[in-house]
């Protein structure tokens, strides 16, 4: 991709169509590697002088990413029997917290919880998001009131807000 005078981005693809090299602005290069199932297994981004990211990805037998190891540490992922993401554990370099997710019978996310906040989601009979409510756990140090966002849809089912 060029702007008419210089190359802004350059891509190299594998025979399977996956990107293997991406160069941006001539000085940032991302290199991708894939496993036999074409899941990304490594991604390294660097300049001539510095490594910006060096991530390695690991998967379970269902193809779910269960771990990402990078410069900032290891992020872990857990899933339920329906392969829905239920927990993310972040390394200390990214705050060292755990995020837990819950779902209803239809597979809609209905809860997200961290040490700092709880977010709940409510859906209509068509499984469209109707309401998002975020409450902060530590009210001693936070003056924030619970946040609520309501969503509406037109007759075609397009979200208006």
Question: Where in the sequence are the language-model features?
Answer:
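Beta-strand elements of repeat-based all-beta scaffolds
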Residues: 1-3, 7-24, 28-69, 74-92, ...
């Amino acid at each position: 991709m060029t702007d008419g005078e210089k190359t802004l981005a350059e891509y190299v693809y594998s025979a399977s169509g996956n990107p293997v090299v991406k160069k941006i602005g001539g000085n940032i290069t991302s290199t991708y590697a894939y496993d036999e199932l074409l899941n990304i297994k490594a991604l390294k981004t660097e300049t001539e002088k510095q490594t910006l990211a060096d991530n390695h990805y690991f998967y379970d037998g269902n193809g779910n990413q269960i771990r990402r190891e990078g410069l900032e540490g290891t992020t872990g992922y857990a899933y339920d029997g329906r392969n829905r993401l239920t927990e993310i554990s972040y390394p200390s370099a990214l705050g060292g917290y755990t995020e837990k997710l819950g779902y209803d019978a239809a597979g809609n996310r209905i809860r997200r919880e961290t040490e700092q906040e709880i977010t709940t989601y409510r859906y209509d009979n068509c499984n469209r998001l109707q309401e998002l409510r975020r409450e902060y756990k530590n009210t001693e140090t936070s003056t924030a009131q619970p946040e609520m966002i309501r969503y509406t849809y037109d007759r075609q089912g397009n979200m208006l807000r």
